[in-house]
Amino acid sequence: MLSKQIPLGIYEKALPAGECWLERLRLAKTLGFDFVEMSVDETDARLARLDWSREQRLALVSAVAETGVRVPSMCLSAHRRFPLGSEDDAVRAQGLEIMRKAIQFAQDVGIRVIQLAGYDVYYQQANDETRCRFRDGLKESVDMASRAQVTLAMEIMDYPLMNSISKALGYAHYLNNPWFQLYPDIGNLSAWDNDVQMELQAGSGHIVAVHVKDTKPGVFKNVPFGEGVVDFERCFETLKQSGYCGPYLIEMWSETAENPAAEVAKARDWVKARMAKAGMVEAA
């Protein structure tokens, strides 16, 4: 029987670094998480995962089966380095090839959702042409994802092009494809001048997962829970009232901390306490 509890996951970069997924999933299970989100960022080491052998892919599937901790989503931030909106045709082609490989990887190992970074370009100056190329790249990507039955979900970003659910919904309407949905980050959403509760309501029916982190205006990473501007309780209440029953993912970057597991456990307890106040989970 499927659990009726809210699925709570942890970002890979919150846990100790390394390539042994069996160890990582065992630790996540010990810490009480239902799933781990994989990172494929712009580093060569994590990009290399998209070229894993059949045996390496099977090892991940086996680790999921052995531990019962799922890997249902991938945070694909590699497009910072190889953006779909790049005016350099070779760079853009690499970005599309990364997308193709990521979708194939997801299909092979059972990942259901690939979270996309909403950057037309990141290290270059954006303009009308980069935005046009980005839209066309998304269209091509969603066509590939549709054939593979893998969902592409746009993150709400630390970048003006995609810093609200309203803006991401514009792309959803443009693409008009059920395999393109939204993956908001309540931290990023709160760090901008957004009516956060209205934005979450606007995304109703399109949100497939939610990133949970704290932020401050202009500071989008490594803000300890409770020290930023995010009204977690109200966000959780709004999502619950909108009918959202999907997964929540605690996003942290504690893999290089002295004791990552302790940092994660502290964050887990803090987030679950706010969820309990919002009536989503039972109080500990």
Curated annotation (Swiss-Prot):
Keywords: Isomerase. Pathway: Cofactor degradation; L-ascorbate degradation; D-xylulose 5-phosphate from L-ascorbate: step 3/4. Induction: Induced by L-ascorbate. Repressed by UlaR. Catalyzes the isomerization of L-xylulose-5-phosphate to L-ribulose-5-phosphate. Is involved in the anaerobic L-ascorbate utilization. This is L-ribulose-5-phosphate 3-epimerase UlaE. It is an enzyme of class 5 (isomerase). Belongs to the L-ribulose-5-phosphate 3-epimerase family. InterPro entries: L-Ru-5P_3-Epase, L-Ru-5P_3-Epase_Enterobacteria, Sugar_Epim/Isomerase, Xyl_isomerase-like_sf, Xyl_isomerase-like_TIM-brl. It comes from Salmonella paratyphi A (strain AKU_12601). Transmembrane segments: none annotated. The keyword Transmembrane does not apply. The keyword Isomerase applies. GO terms for biological process: L-ascorbic acid catabolic process. PANTHER family: ISOMERASE (PTHR43489), L-RIBULOSE-5-PHOSPHATE 3-EPIMERASE ULAE (PTHR43489:SF8). Its EC number is 5.1.3.22. Pfam families: AP_endonuc_2. One of its GO terms (molecular function) is L-ribulose-5-phosphate 3-epimerase activity. It catalyses: L-ribulose 5-phosphate = L-xylulose 5-phosphate.
